[in-house]
Amino acid sequence: MANAYGFVGHSVPTMKRAAQFQQMGSGFCSADSISKRVFCCSVVQGADKPASGDSRTEYRTPRLVSRGCKLVGSGSAMPALQVSNDDLSKIVDTNDEWISVRTGIRNRRVLTGKESLTNLATVAARKALEMAQVDANDVDMVLMCTSTPEDLFGSAPQIQKALGCKKNPLAYDITAACSGFVLGLVSAACHIRGGGFNNILVIGADSLSRYVDWTDRGTCILFGDAAGAVLVQSCDAEEDGLFAFDLHSDGDGQRHLKAAITENGIDHAVGSNGSVSDFPPRSSSYSCIQMNGKEVFRFACRCVPQSIESALGKAGLNGSNIDWLLLHQANQRIIDAVATRLEVPQERVISNLANYGNTSAASIPLALDEAVRGGKVKAGHLIATAGFGAGLTWGSAIVRWG
């Protein structure tokens, strides 16, 4: 029986118990989520007419069919300017060995005044459409996963316009920092399974170089700019390519990684009688990225493998079933620690961190696109992917390519 949201009741597994929360030693929390895959339904080309002799004058309830989604195209783009560790050693007290040993990073790309993040995202999206052989006019949603939009109100509509989508498909931003792309994938799946959408572009793009303190060697060495995209397409439920996911947030960890709003200028007093104070408000901007690296490292090494194990369990799989482990490219030590915890050998771990640094929401689709175009990831391969970062927010998804 279909409910008001278009979901079929009997095909949605019920929760056997209430979510169980437990507090970690560091104060972070975890929770058990709804298990197993959920197949949703949407209308198939309207309703059936009543049979001959049927006394009802209204059309019957539209038929419903199960729907799945699959990843069918990828693309990526990055700025032209490459900044090496040696380049950074000229502006802060550091060197190539110090950076590469602690992070695994050797180079990163940085946007200049001649480039824009929106243009990078558009290029990546076009490449994904070309690989999938889908016309821009067949796209019915654009999701821009970013924490650094070039417009306060979001960049997705500008990308939709640049792509030339003539049917005005829905386009909006998702802000979840380095977890953004995974949340975008899950959001796309929900729109397809329950909302009747067919071709959704999920773009991860960030330019964190604009929010870096280039005198702080603890953070300026980490970040780069880039964009990556995938096309998520509807399919029959039997071909579904999103097997399971696991998503979490913990606002208590915000103190360890943030770029908080700051007030600029001076108070603009209104009148002289003191009846109105602090108005108009001061103009605001965001601070540079502030990070407690040790705490973020501990958080990632603890929560990410837990999340992936949870998603694998929901899918009825284990680490030996996956072909590739693809994590947010934040730090090679984190990637190695998670792979060791999951017993995934290094030859099945995708990493391009050395070339691009931490590109936030772009890191997973960028690495995926390079792996697909390089022949590593092939149709039918299973990928365990996970994002983690500011919020604190983290999540994982088990997906099949193609």
Curated annotation (Swiss-Prot):
Major localisation: plastid
Catalytic activity entry: malonyl-[ACP] + acetyl-CoA + H(+) = 3-oxobutanoyl-[ACP] + CO2 + CoA
Active site: C178, H328, N358
One BP term from GO: fatty acid biosynthetic process
Gene Ontology CC terms, in alphabetical order: chloroplast
EC number from the UniProt entry: 2.3.1.180
Signal peptide: none
Keyword set includes Ubl conjugation: no
Pathway(s) this gene product operates in, as recorded in its UniProt entry: Lipid metabolism; fatty acid biosynthesis
Compartment(s) where it occurs, according to its Swiss-Prot or TrEMBL record: Plastid, Chloroplast
Pfam families in the record: ACP_syn_III (PF08545), ACP_syn_III_C (PF08541)
Superkingdom to which the source organism belongs: Eukaryota
Family statement drawn from the similarity comment of this UniProt entry: Belongs to the thiolase-like superfamily. FabH family.
Protein's name in the database: Beta-ketoacyl-[acyl-carrier-protein] synthase III B, chloroplastic
Gene: KAS3B
